[in-house]
């Protein structure tokens, strides 16, 4: 029984080490919520809005990047800065990133949440809609990572969260376009993580 306990403890330590990108120090000590700045794309509704509210509860300053208007309930909240930004437009993302840095400072958290979907069959999906869906659901993540990851690397501190879906793994007949975009998004996120920890 003692041997199982020891094996369990060692396993737990190795799991913690792996989750901490094989760094020996405890990353939790470096995070002071009231000093953190988070970017949330698509933060004006749905999952993004819920994430914004949770970050605000922890005292994190939040920059919302969205094409929708900020909900009235959040307009007077001191912890929020709203930036109207089409995240599918790379120039808009880089311009907004500069505005965020001037207004709040360099972010330590990036939550890529913006996404769109509408049920379609493969045959009824227009090329315009398909391009828009991939621009918002996939390429916007590329642009925001290019815009904000250098700040995190410079500070040697940061988290990038990708809001994906079970659709990354399983394709529904009526949502092939959406599922394909989420599979691409998962692949991008895993590749970005691998590059980041390898120093590339």
Residue ranges of model-derived segments:
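Canonical Rossmann dinucleotide-binding motif of NAD(H)/NADP(H)-dependent dehydrogenases/reductases
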Residues: 23-63
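Conserved NAD(P)H cofactor-binding loop of Rossmann-fold oxidoreductase domains
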Residues: 113-118
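Active-site loop-to-helix junction immediately N-terminal to the catalytic Tyr of the SDR YXXXK motif
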Residues: 125, 171-179
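Active-site helix of classical SDR
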Residues: 145, 181
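The beta1-alpha1 cofactor-binding region of Rossmann-like NAD(H)/NADP(H)-dependent oxidoreductases
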Residues: 83-98, 127
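Residue(s) in the substrate-gating loop at a strand-loop-helix junction
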Residues: 165
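Substrate-binding pocket helix/loop in short-chain dehydrogenase/reductase
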Residues: 121-122, 126-131
């Amino acid at each position: 029984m003692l041997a199982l306990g020891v094996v369990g403890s060692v396993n737990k330590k190795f799991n913690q080490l792996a989750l901490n990108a094989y760094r020996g120090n405890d990353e939790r000590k470096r995070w002071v919520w009231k000093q953190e700045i988070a970017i949330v794309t698509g933060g004006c509704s749905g999952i993004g809005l819920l994430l914004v509210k949770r970050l605000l509860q922890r005292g994190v300053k939040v920059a919302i990047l969205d094409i929708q208007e900020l909900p009235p309930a959040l307009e007077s909240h001191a912890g929020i800065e709203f930036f109207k930004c089409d995240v599918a437009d790379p120039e808009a993302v880089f311009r907004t990133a500069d505005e965020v840095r001037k207004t709040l400072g360099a972010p330590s958290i990036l939550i890529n949440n913006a996404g769109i979907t509408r049920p379609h069959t493969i045959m009824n999906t227009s090329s315009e809609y398909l391009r828009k869906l991939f621009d918002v659901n996939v390429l916007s993540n590329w642009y925001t990572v290019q815009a904000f990851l250098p700040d995190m690397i410079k500070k040697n501190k940061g988290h990038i969260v990708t809001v994906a879906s079970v659709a990354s793994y399983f394709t529904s007949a009526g949502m092939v376009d959406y599922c394909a975009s989420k599979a691409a998004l998962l692949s991008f996120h895993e590749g970005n993580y691998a590059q980041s920890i390898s120093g590339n």
